């Protein structure tokens, strides 16, 4: 296999998904830990935060190897985070319903789960459209998509 100087498109997109998911998760963990009073649970949050920060630090050096990446930063409010978190929730819901349906033997329950799966798919589409229209998820512009990942990961890491 030859040595490439850039990542392949498919691995770049997988990296994007991981970094976007973990960045939103890290922001959520850092916001939520403030409310956690139980010392043992708080320690679990700290371990999780440190682990995700390390994951992001290990993945970020690969971003310059992504194909056609441009360097330009811009600041954004929390709307990208909240909408990204909602998109992740919708995506996870779709996956969870799909898995549950494959494990369901009762037709009535299956019908309810299919209905709920379709609702989750619709929610995902609505949130995606919102994010795309507002420039939070530039899915057809890989350079912008990756810049957002880097910005969000760095924001999540530096957040106190």
Curated annotation (Swiss-Prot):
Keywords: Sporulation. Residues 1-4 form a propeptide. GO terms for biological process: sporulation resulting in formation of a cellular spore. It is found in: Spore coat. InterPro entries: Ferritin-like (IPR012347), Spore_coat_CotF (IPR016493), Spore_coat_CotF-like (IPR012851). Generates the two 5 and 8 kDa components of the spore coat, after proteolytic processing. Gene3D superfamilies: 1.20.1260.10. Pfam families: Coat_F. Belongs to the CotF family. Present in an increased level in yabG mutant spores. PANTHER family: SPORE COAT PROTEIN F-LIKE PROTEIN YHCQ. This is Spore coat protein F. It comes from Bacillus subtilis (strain 168). The gene is cotF.
